[in-house]
Design a protein with these regions (language model features):
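Contiguous interface-forming segments/domains that mediate binding rather than catalysis
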Residues: 1-103, 107-133
Length: 133
């Protein structure tokens, strides 16, 4: 059976969740992923809910009893994969002549194995005198 737009789009998002889950050694309640793609600039971030609290990726070892590899190398590897996945989504949107989101907000609930996704299609930062640098 041939893949369709939705399959390829979701496959890239699933990879984003997978790499973030791997980064935290499958030990999170929720994973939050943010990506922005405007005017050829792609940015992103990811953070976690662990033990009922929100933690940035570089602060995970502040969690009592936890010891993660939060090295710059590991964070960079995860970020590279996230941004490559956004580029894959760009290619999928182009292939299927679909609009490309300018902003992704993904929340993955580990226990429920469910993904809540919110997309914006208008520029959020470009040309905004306050939000852009």
């Amino acid at each position: 059976m041939a893949k369709i737009f939705e399959d390829e789009f979701m496959e890239a998002q699933a990879d984003m969740v997978s790499i973030c889950l791997e980064y935290v050694e499958d030990d999170a309640e929720k994973i939050y992923i943010y990506a922005s793609c405007e005017n050829r600039a792609i940015t992103g971030d990811y953070f976690y809910k662990i033990n009922g609290q929100i933690w940035q990726r570089h602060h995970l070892n502040r969690i009592p009893g936890k010891n993660y590899d939060v090295s710059g190398e590991r964070q960079g590897m995860c970020m590279r994969i996230l941004l490559q996945d956004v580029q894959k989504i760009q290619a999928v949107c182009k292939t299927y002549n679909q609009p490309m989101p300018t902003q992704f907000k993904l929340v993955y609930d580990v226990a429920k194995n469910s993904l809540d996704a919110h997309y914006e299609y208008e520029n959020q930062y470009s040309y905004d005198p306050v939000k852009s640098s």
